[in-house]
């Protein structure tokens, strides 16, 4: 039997898809690409935006057109957040949520065997539930491994449907994380990325902390780089920063969630910090890791309800002033079940899209300038994608994309380079 996966959304979703693929392989299935015909099609959905829901439905329709006899599965955040709507999608033979992923295999078998015509298996998240272990040892990139350490979010930001889609904070057992890291190191992975729905919340439900996990992860032989997923700035304290800076394996690249550079908009979004507090945390990280050594990335929403032109200009000024290496810009998506859904002064779609284009153009200029400022510096690069026998793309510790000729090296090697010119997509570099 052949199974294929279509994944939308964040690194956590990608990690979970990989774990599901491994589960199906271990039970006799062959995992194939989206372009190949399959007996089972699994859509791992994202519901952060309306567009994500639309793409999930579109892919299910495509799967049924390609193979009307196949079993189609809709799983993940979309069904969990909107179970009634998801259950009505006729093209989905199996509908499951963001929990109890192990049951997908059994649900699929029920339909394949004719025991059930359709399976709707969406289970509500409950307070006190435990982290669901989904072991994973193989990654498509073969060089960087994503390790999920936490699920759920206890915050209630006005725009965000994720707490509804993912449930409360649930931390993975520390011993389980470290055991997976040891397996990955034995398999040759040199860089790991700790991913989560609310990464700084790790350990808040189990008496430990993210910093403790980072320190112990750094002790795993063979792991040379540790990278962090998204961080909420207000959850980073002075002692956390001091301890993280002492971990030499920790990549000095921080994805600090911002969402807006306007204080009025941040208050409306129910984000628990001001732009001044955000800038202060970034300044402390720069001081601890070295101003020329650290980089920042972030997410920004434009067109939030009530955002005036002046608010947008203030946000853009703050964002460009922070000198982010990369910014993900999103036009606000109105999500049912969130506080902002009922806010007055909803902006028209064309205005949100226009602001998205303006913000994107501004942050791309900053990205190019930041990359150009690194020209001539020495950096270590993890070789990832071979373009030829000797040419590779890869990333520095600061997550700067690099193109380098490295004869005699292979994917997965870490090499020392001198950074060169920025070509609009990546830095050209030469081996030291």
What are these regions (language model features)?
Residues 47-52, 189-216, 220, 232-239, ...:
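Conserved glycine-rich "GG(E/T)P / GGGxP" loop and the immediately following alpha-helix
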Residues 160-167, 225-234, 260-270, 291-311, ...:
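Conserved strand-turn element in the central/C-terminal portion of the radical SAM core barrel
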Residues 256, 299, 319, 327, ...:
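Hydrophobic, well-ordered secondary-structure elements that form the walls
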Residues 186, 211-212, 219-220, 225, ...:
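Radical SAM/AdoMet-radical enzyme domain recognition
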Residues 307, 322-324:
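Contiguous mid-protein beta-loop-alpha structural module that forms a pocket-lining wall or clamp
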Residues 342-432:
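Terminal RNA-binding accessory module
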